[in-house]
Swiss-Prot record:
Protein name per Swiss-Prot or TrEMBL: Unknown protein 1
Superkingdom: Eukaryota
Classification lineage: Eukaryota, Fungi, Dikarya, Basidiomycota, Agaricomycotina
Length: 23
């Protein structure tokens, strides 16, 4: 489960948007 959260934060740091928005 931690991997999923880590990926979400990774997207936010990269794209600067929330996972829900990026998805």
């Amino acid at each position: 489960v931690a991997i999923i959260i880590y990926s979400m934060y990774g997207h936010i740091a990269k794209y600067g948007n929330f996972p829900g928005q990026w998805k």
